[in-house]
Amino acid sequence: NLNIEMKIPEGMDKAHISDYLEKMYYGNVQLFNEHKNQIVKYDAVLIDEIQDYHRSWMEIIKNFFRDPQGDYVLFGDVKQNIYGQPTLQKDVVTNVRSVNELKYCFRSDFKVRDLAQSFQKNVFGDKYDTDDFSENGSYDFFGQQQQKEGYINYMYLQDKDHIRSLYNIIRGNILNKAGNISPNDITILGFTTGLFRTFDAYYRYACREKTNSMLETIETMYMSNLNYIGKNNDKNPNTGWFNNITEHLKKKLFIKRTTLYDTDIIKLRQHIAILFTIYDLFVSYPENFRERLIEECDKCGISIDALIAFRKHYEEILTQFKKEVYNSNYKSIRDNKKLHFWMNSGTIKISTINSFKGWESE
């Protein structure tokens, strides 16, 4: 720890803070050179996921944190270069002279491996060298080719509503126990966060089972914004409807309380977040979630007609509020979820491709 105090200029746009810190601190070679005598040096430096590193970070680590006679070893996979770092001859550009290529993959004997390899050849064939599974020992002692576990099934979703179709396929496999599939064996991958957030809510409220999602839940999104309104109630455009529903639920949920404790406020806002989440589902799928919304309204001591009337009365401002909720940045929540990922949660896993670590679907 060099005890370097980082200062961000007042009024700087949040969108520019990351670039500013990179230029002035994280990637500032001169800054580390000025403090080089204070830096502890190591006999060996091993770096994993080198494709995520800026070149300046590599230079800083190699020149200031490694003993001049020490080892410097980098591990990386150009196919995971999701931040678009520079590449040369289908590989990540680093500050080492030679590369020892690990040509073979020994991670999987499942049939999903074939899908991954086919995807590499067809989509990334001109950009990357594809993984070679030829040395994975695919033959038994009698010279017969082994059958890989699992199966690949392609389905054309005719229904434009992919969320409902996806749910019906997955629940059908679970309920019919196709291939002895349990929720814990299922991982759903895609690239659209908006679709996955809605699917996650659809799944949980339709079948009343939990999920293990690497994305923020819609309830968490609403809760984050409700807390912000609660702390910034003065001159907030959402004050009217926020105070209205807060006071109403306060009377229904905490009948004998004149003052709410912090835990009570959290519980009340959680009810609002859940109500708003199920209401969003109800608007898109009225035949599927009307009864579920009525059930949640009963928990809050209100009728579904009263909730619908409330939403209608504040329709314009609540429509704008919903846009803000769905378009806000929740990266910190996603990072925290990835950090605390647990594979054997007993539930289905939901993740975007760039947050998917390896072969957890096995």
Where are these regions (language model features)?
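Conserved RecA-like ASCE ATPase "motif II neighborhood" in helicase/translocase motors
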Residues: 4-43, 49, 53-60, 348-355
